[in-house]
């Protein structure tokens, strides 16, 4: 990945959670105007609900971000072995501090590139990928690596931004967010992602809210 991505997320570290969680008036206004009022909190809850509270296997969270949506879930997953990877050192620092405050001890944080995951083949029972694929610069490598480290019969669950649902959102993604380094084209459409996933997975859940797709799939 590029230094531009590192720098873009370093610059946004103080507003990242506010935007995702709609916790300020300006973040709610931004989400309403440019994202059609989509509530990332609700989407995240749906995705995280695909993971059983009593899960006791190995889970990879990539990118972990700040852990704002996952910390509460991980706090009750005592039997799980969780690996949290992100390219951004700033995101990892925030996640580490959040997990420390929540006394979450079953998460290992790793700085790394989703396009070259430092794990063996078929290492994980679940791969969770929230708000990442619209930012990953080499999406083909990312898809390949996620598939490689997931066990056959394992679960891929996630959500991210897609194009083709709103002209206003598409403009924001290509003209603003991509230029800032927060997003990286090309972007999937609802149908292109479905076709891609169906080549290697059974789609158990596949939905969209505005320009956000969320899903649960089982690797064949």
Where do the model's predicted regions map?
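A short acidic, Gly/Pro-enriched loop at the edge of an enzyme's catalytic core
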Residues: 115-126
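Class I SAM-dependent methyltransferase SAM/SAH-binding core
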Residues: 58-116
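A short SAM/SAH-binding and catalytic strip from SAM-dependent methyltransferases
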Residues: 126-138
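Short glycine-centered segments of the SAM/dcSAM-binding site in methyltransferase folds
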Residues: 58, 154-155
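Conserved class I S-adenosyl-L-methionine
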Residues: 1-53, 68, 72
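C-terminal alpha-helical "lid/dimerization" subdomain adjacent to the S-adenosyl-L-methionine
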Residues: 157-209, 213-215
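A generic alpha-to-beta junction signature in SAM-dependent methyltransferases
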Residues: 51, 76-77, 150
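A short glycine-rich, Lys/Arg-flanked "PGG" loop and its adjoining helix->strand segment in the class I
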Residues: 140-152
């Amino acid at each position: 990945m590029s230094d531009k991505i590192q720098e873009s997320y370093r610059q946004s570290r103080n507003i990242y959670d506010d935007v995702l969680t709609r916790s300020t008036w300006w973040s709610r206004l931004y989400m309403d105007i440019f994202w059609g009022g989509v509530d990332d909190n609700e989407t995240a809850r749906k995705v995280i609900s695909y993971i059983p509270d009593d899960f006791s296997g190995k889970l990879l969270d990539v990118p972990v971000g700040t852990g704002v949506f996952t910390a509460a879930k991980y706090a009750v997953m005592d039997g799980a072995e969780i690996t949290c990877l992100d390219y951004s050192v700033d995101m990892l620092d925030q996640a580490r501090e959040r997990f420390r405050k929540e006394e979450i001890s079953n998460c290992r944080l790793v700085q790394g590139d989703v396009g070259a995951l430092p794990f063996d083949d078929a290492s994980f029972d679940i791969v969770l990928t929230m708000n990442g694929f619209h930012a990953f610069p080499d999406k083909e490598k990312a898809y390949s690596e996620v598939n490689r480290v997931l066990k056959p019969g394992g679960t891929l669950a996630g959500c991210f931004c897609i194009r083709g649902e709103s002209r206003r959102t598409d403009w924001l993604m290509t003209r603003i967010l991509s230029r800032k380094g927060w997003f990286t084209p090309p972007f999937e459409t609802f149908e292109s992602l479905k076709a891609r996933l169906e080549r290697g997975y059974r789609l158990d859940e596949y939905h969209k809210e505005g320009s956000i797709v969320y899903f649960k799939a089982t690797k064949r």
